[in-house]
Amino acid sequence: MGVRMLACVILGFLAVAINCDEAPNITADATTITTTRKPIPYQDSNICKLCKCEDTKVNCYDQSITTFFTLNEWEDIIDLKPSTVDLSENRFTNITVIADLTIEVLNLSRCSIEFIQSGSFRDLQEMRVLDLSHNKLTTDKLSPHAFEGRFAPEEYEPLASMRILNLAYNDLHSLNQDLFEHMPELEELDLSGNPLTTIDHVTLVAISSLPMLKVLRLRSCELDEIPSKFLHTPRFLENLDLSDNKLTIVPRELEEAKDLIYLNLNQNPIEVIDFYSEDNPGFPRLHKLQELHMCNMPKLRSIGPKALAGLESVEKLHISFNPSLSYLDPKALARPDDIGESFDWPLVKELYLKSNNLTEVDTRLLSRWDLLEKVDVSDNPFLCDCSTQWMVDVLAPIVESKGSNATLMVCQEPIEMRGHTMKDLHDSHRTMRCVDKYGHRPEKDGAILLGTLIGVLLAVPIMLSLMLLWRRGYFAWLGLRPPADVSRAFYKRAPADDILY
């Protein structure tokens, strides 16, 4: 009996041991079963029910989506192999991890996004363009971890394909100095519309960490200066937009951008650009710059000699809609040659001087007007005299031949020329006179001389008639006696009883 009891106890322990040993495998199998999802056609996915999915494009524009898609929902469209995903104009505020997809362009603009989870884009290894503009991202909530790549034993892998990042019109007052550490190949960065006010040290470090940067947009960032060495590291920078800021002078730091091709300084409160001024210096030497924009600058009054001389290769010059710009020096673009005996000019192909306050465009501004491909100098209060005769004879035909309207080149002064167009003056072969140096108006002399002559011719017979009437006594009632009465009064006989002394 005792032996049987012992055998039963031993068998019981063995059974428990066997069950305990098999339990993990059972649990593991159960877990596998619960986590494995049955694949579905991408047409039946939740994403493609809410959005339009076709031709490797997912269009979710303005679909009132309030919650970002889950990882599983993204996995359901793997077979679609999407290259472009547009989720703009929706209402979600948080971004979570996206599945391993072939997305190249991802648009998340205008969605009120406030937070991006760490590693949200880590599996998008083919993504080239990411648009996060017009959201509510702040300096505190935009972490470098948001852009980290896949995990590796030593460090996170970069988002190697990323080339364009748009962070415009968020609420960024500064940038984390490591914000772009996972995007070493980034070529285009847009920070426009963020209230940076100034480029502090950490922001400078962040942007300086992008050695391959080619395009930088800082429009409407309330900047009043550009810090030293800001443009030193991005040595391949070609396109720089500093428009609509508070710059009062042309930044000297531009000389660090040796490869700059395009520069936009529109809507800045610059008043004077003068090569010889320390307070308002001209442009530094930018020998590769091809296109310059200085438009809609209400305070710009004067562009002096050699102010633009540093722009040796400029081809497109936009200086329009500056209502106070009344002086553009004839040698604004001229630079001394290597010998110093003469001047060289850039070969400008497109010149826009529309809607300024210029009274003339000097022929010396360019060396080869005939090489212009586009030109617009309309809507300026031109002085039409001998100094602008060349505009009538040469410039007006050039403007007309390039597709612009020369009838918009209208004379404002002198008064007798007001309203005449330079095209009409050219067609009528009009030769304009020189305005008097002291402001005299000889064109009015004829009227004055004619009036004087008429006055003299009328005054002589009138005076003769009055003299005749006076001699005949017609004005006696006025106390004006005729000459006969006066002469008789001189010889009146004296009385006989007058006593002589």
Located regions from the model:
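Extracellular leucine-rich repeat
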Residues: 2-501
